[in-house]
Amino acid sequence: MSHSKSSQRWLKEHFSDPFVKKAQAEGMRSRAAYKLEEILKRDRILRPNMVVIDLGAAPGGWSQQIRKQMGDSGRVIALDIVKMAPLVGIEFLQGDFRDKAVLSQLEIMLKGQPVDLVLSDMAPNKSGIDVMDQPRMMYLAELAMDFADIHVKPGGSFLIKLFHGVGSDGYIRQLRHRYKKVAIRKPLASRKRSPEVYILGDGKLTQNEVSCS
């Protein structure tokens, strides 16, 4: 299939997508908000007054969904290397979360508050070549897991997008040593042909529990 035909097919599918239409009608910045909504309803990991960090947040659909679910309570801190237009009730930090200066700024923003939930909907710019895209995705996933290891409090949760493929099973095994419950989710808003899945780690183990597991 030619590039132009592929692009035309994507555009047609995109604009006829019910979740795209719903996002436009409800003022959500992306259809991804409804993937998160389904997971939150199913797994009930979000409660009032939580502190939530959204990695790779732009354009902001996940942050919007968290704020919608928590109302005026708690804090939502969105992090991204690219600029994100302001959202009511969302604190935004622009920068690379691997950067020590950015992490220092995050610590200042947190003011010692423990983090209840870390989200990551990050993905690399796709080339369409699996042998290139999958390692890039797993690299981002490892970075996000390291971030969650440091920032999520014991008993807290971590939700991340993965591409199912080389390295994903091993990654899930790593999470099983870190969280009491690990679940794999494929929301309705996730296109069937997409390799993406969402992995939830709930009930972060303490260091003593990790050592005994």
UniProtKB/Swiss-Prot annotation:
Please give the start and end residues of each transmembrane region. none
* Residues holding S-adenosyl-L-methionine: G60, W62, D80, D96, D121
Q: Which GO terms describe its molecular function?
A: rRNA (uridine-2'-O-)-methyltransferase activity
The record lists the catalysed reaction(s) as: uridine(2552) in 23S rRNA + S-adenosyl-L-methionine = 2'-O-methyluridine(2552) in 23S rRNA + S-adenosyl-L-homocysteine + H(+)
Q: What is its main location?
A: cytoplasm
Active-site feature positions: K161 (proton acceptor)
Homology family: Belongs to the class I-like SAM-binding methyltransferase superfamily. RNA methyltransferase RlmE family.
Chain's role: Specifically methylates the uridine in position 2552 of 23S rRNA at the 2'-O position of the ribose in the fully assembled 50S ribosomal subunit.
Q: Where in the cell is it found?
A: Cytoplasm
Please identify the protein, giving its name as recorded. Answer: Ribosomal RNA large subunit methyltransferase E
Gene behind this chain?
A: rlmE
Q: Which GO terms describe its cellular component?
A: cytoplasm
Give the EC number(s) listed in the UniProt record: 2.1.1.166
Q: In which organism is this protein found? A: Xylella fastidiosa (strain Temecula1 / ATCC 700964)
Q: For this UniProt record, give its keywords in alphabetical order, as a comma-separated list.
A: Cytoplasm, Methyltransferase, rRNA processing, S-adenosyl-L-methionine, Transferase
Output the Pfam families linked to this UniProt entry: FtsJ
